[in-house]
């Protein structure tokens, strides 16, 4: 059991480190996002889009709850029904400790995923509020190019001549004119795209979605290198 406990502990430490970089360490855009509050009434078309973004987030959160929190609730019900003393008679203290540690990890994963989807929803609201009509029309085209289950979770957004890439652990703001080259290839999760600006950004998207990204970058940088 010591090996199981060690693996759980290492997984917990790695998860906490990842949570730090995702939730606490913010770039300039994410710092602005943290201070953002909706200020303007949006058009009916934009409000309709944001409502569907919210529905997507709630739908994903519901799935996450079922997958990650159901085991924790079952364990708590068992503790209430049997009583803590009975559990101590049936299981040594170290087994109970390992079980609680293994249940803590799914709860933290749920918390992290919930944070990411809430952050992305807030960022989309902020960008949709600030973008031009042409940028919003492009956002809708990108939406239609995505897989039906991810249409309201775009990999990138163009707003006021800036590109915003939605990576899991961060949202990066990049000037398309500063992108030097774009490489791509196929992976298990789809089309794998590598963007240099000069910092390297890696993200996955469909080929059709990539075509919109290339159009944007070529519009601001005609010397862009693509592979």
Feature locations, PLM:
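Hydrophobic transmembrane signal anchors and adjacent membrane-proximal interface regions, especially
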Residues: 1, 89-91, 95-96, 137-140, ...
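Eukaryotic intrinsically disordered, low-complexity regulatory linkers and tails enriched in Ser/Thr/Pro
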Residues: 1-134, 151, 227
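N-terminal recruitment modules of adaptor/scaffold proteins
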Residues: 111-172, 181-183
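Acidic, Ser/Thr- and proline-rich intrinsically disordered linker/docking segments
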Residues: 125-138, 181-227
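Short, surface-exposed beta-strand-loop junctions and turns on beta-sheet-rich folds
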Residues: 170-173, 199-201
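Domain-scale macromolecular recognition modules
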Residues: 172-175, 192
């Amino acid at each position: 059991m010591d090996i199981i406990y060690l693996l759980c502990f290492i997984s917990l430490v790695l998860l906490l480190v990842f949570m730090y970089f995702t939730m606490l360490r913010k770039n300039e855009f994410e710092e602005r996002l943290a201070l953002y509050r909706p200020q303007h009434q949006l058009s009916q078309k934009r409000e309709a889009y944001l409502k569907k973004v919210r529905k997507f987030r709630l739908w994903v959160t519901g799935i996450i709850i079922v997958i990650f929190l159901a085991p924790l609730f079952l364990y708590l019900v068992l503790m209430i029904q049997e009583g803590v003393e009975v559990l101590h008679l049936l299981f040594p203290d170290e087994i109970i400790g390992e079980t609680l540690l293994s249940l803590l990890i799914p709860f933290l994963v749920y918390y992290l995923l919930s944070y990411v989807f809430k952050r992305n929803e807030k960022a989309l609201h902020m960008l949709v509020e600030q973008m031009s009509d042409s940028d919003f029309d492009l956002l809708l085209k990108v939406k239609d190019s995505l897989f039906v289950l991810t249409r309201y979770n775009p990999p990138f957004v163009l707003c006021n001549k800036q590109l915003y890439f939605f990576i899991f652990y961060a949202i990066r703001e990049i000037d398309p004119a500063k992108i030097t080259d774009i490489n791509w290839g196929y992976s298990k999760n789809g089309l794998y795209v590598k963007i240099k600006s000069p910092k390297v950004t890696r993200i996955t998207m469909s080929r059709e979605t990539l075509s919109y990204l290339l159009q944007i970058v070529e519009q601001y940088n005609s010397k862009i290198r693509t592979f």
